[in-house]
Amino acid sequence: MMNSSQTLVVKLGTSVLTGGSRRLNRAHIVELVRQCAQQHEKGHRIIIVTSGAIAAGREHLGYPDLPATIASKQLLAAVGQSRLIQLWEQFFSIYGIHVGQMLLTRADLEDRERFLNARDTLQALLDNRIVPVINENDAVATAEIKVGDNDNLSALAAILGGADKLLLLTDIEGLYTADPRNNPDAKLIPEVYDISDELRMVAGDSISGLGTGGMATKLQAAGIAGRAGIDVIIAAGNKPDVISDVIEGNPVGTRFHGLESPMENRKRWIFGAPPAGEIIVDHGAETAICEKGSSLLPKGIKNIKGDFSRGEVICIRSLSGKDLAHGVCRYNSDALRLIAGHHSQQISQILGYEYGAVAVHRDDMIVS
């Protein structure tokens, strides 16, 4: 048993909470709460990222026959979110532990000030021995402001909470060399130090659970958290004492090792914030950014996707679509469209103003 206190984010997907059925599996949730409470009592800090609001809403309303629309999903989430937090509160109260609900959207994470506010709230809950229960605010989130899935949300929560480890609980034991339900020769991959393209291909062929996130989104989450120095473990939610094993460092599931030299807090935000748009760059800019550590100049920009403001985080991509870097843009999308392909000396002439010679400065950039 490790003596030092750890901060652990536990992400529970819909498949874990329902056991693959239409109802929330309360007995299983109680067991997971027992494990969390046990570690909480030992001085560890636990953060819950929970799915299941839509499933809880559907169950509470008696499985209504609703059209498969965004409005119907948001209706179910609005009804179910209160039921879901009541369950967590009820089960943690068995052990005398309070919970605090945090509902987040992408907008809370891509704006630096709101990111810091969310971080301060999360830290205040942890400092007061309250277990944060986090979910995406599905009742109000639109496609433009959704993080997209709770795997990536849990990685962002791990960054917000300064976590040591992120545990992604699912319905299989971890990442396999192939889908174990279709291939009897599939083998569990116990440890990962680098998320290669080959590994992404393996994950892309593997489906996990009934929710929005499969194994591919879990690899995305592992990449985000790993860059911040956070270990990520994918494991089966029904494995006995899985949370204790993760805290104690026992081999379980697939462990993705975080970087030994994690990025500073500002760069954690840059890498963690969902991009507000994309900048497509030419081969020269790609080489300058990836091999020389240079800033992005307007001259190297070929295309801009999306609408974003100055100071927002954007994704820089190659002509082939490869994710090269994330960074804080010094010009808004409209201005970039005007100066793209031009020399920096022409910025003031084209726009009538300038915020410097670069579109994204290397100090405000994280290379992927």
Swiss-Prot record:
E.C. number(s) listed in UniProt: 2.7.2.11
Origin superkingdom: Bacteria
Recorded catalytic activity of this chain's protein: L-glutamate + ATP = L-glutamyl 5-phosphate + ADP
Family annotation (Gene3D superfamilies): Acetylglutamate kinase-like (3.40.1160.10), PUA domain (2.30.130.10)
Location within or outside the cell: Cytoplasm
Residues noted as binding substrate in the record, renumbered to the chain: 51, 138, 150
InterPro entries membership: AceGlu_kinase-like_sf (IPR036393), Asp/Glu/Uridylate_kinase (IPR001048), G5K_ProB (IPR041739), Glu/AcGlu_kinase (IPR001057), Glu_5kinase (IPR011529), Glu_5kinase/COase_Synthase (IPR005715), Glutamate_5-kinase_CS (IPR019797), PUA (IPR002478)
Name of the molecule in the record: Glutamate 5-kinase
